[in-house]
Amino acid sequence: MVFIIDTQRHFAHQFTTNPFVIFSNLLGATGHSHAFYKRLTATFSRQRSFGRHIAVVDMWESIRWQILNGDEIEVSPEHRSLAWRELIINVASNTPLDNTFRTMFQKADFENFDYNTPIVYNLKTKTLTMYNERIRAALNRPVRFNDQTVNVNIAYVFLFFICIVLLSVLAVFFDTNIATDTKSKNVAAKIK
């Protein structure tokens, strides 16, 4: 795999085929080791070591990045379309098949989406910053309770109805038993 990065266009692109030493050429090209590059290398190496991040990190290795500032990198403009498509596909494929999850996915949002919108990765917080509010809301988990997401199984409704009928029958039966029980005690008391 090849990881390409353009560091503020100060020098030529640096290539490496070893995913664990992503920025070794970049560190050598600057003449001294910046803490930023070390943190960037450590972040990607740490994410690669976890099993659940492998697909996402492999996806980002084919994307070209450029440095914005000391804490942020962004996808270069010619790779934004690919990055957005890969990100949306990975998030959608890792989503549980449940109606309460990712309810804001709409076909029109993806057909009319501007795939040149920047994607910024913050190295300190390890988060992606997205400037499209609709896509951000669709890719994040729901934060508010929505009455449309409540799933009611018909079997539960039927069981609830049976329980209500049984409780009503039991209440009437015990109420009549108590009434007849007190009447028989009153009759027995009068006979004595």
From Swiss-Prot:
Keywords: Host cytoplasm, Host membrane, Host nucleus, Membrane, Transmembrane, Transmembrane helix, Virion. The keyword Disulfide bond does not apply. Its main location: host cell. The chain crosses the membrane at residues 154-174. It is a single-pass membrane protein. The keyword Transmembrane helix applies. It is found in: Host membrane; Virion; Host cytoplasm; Host nucleus. It holds the Pfam family PIF6. GO terms for cellular component: host cell cytoplasm; host cell membrane; host cell nucleus; membrane; virion component. Per os infectivity factor. This is Per os infectivity factor 6. The gene is AC68.
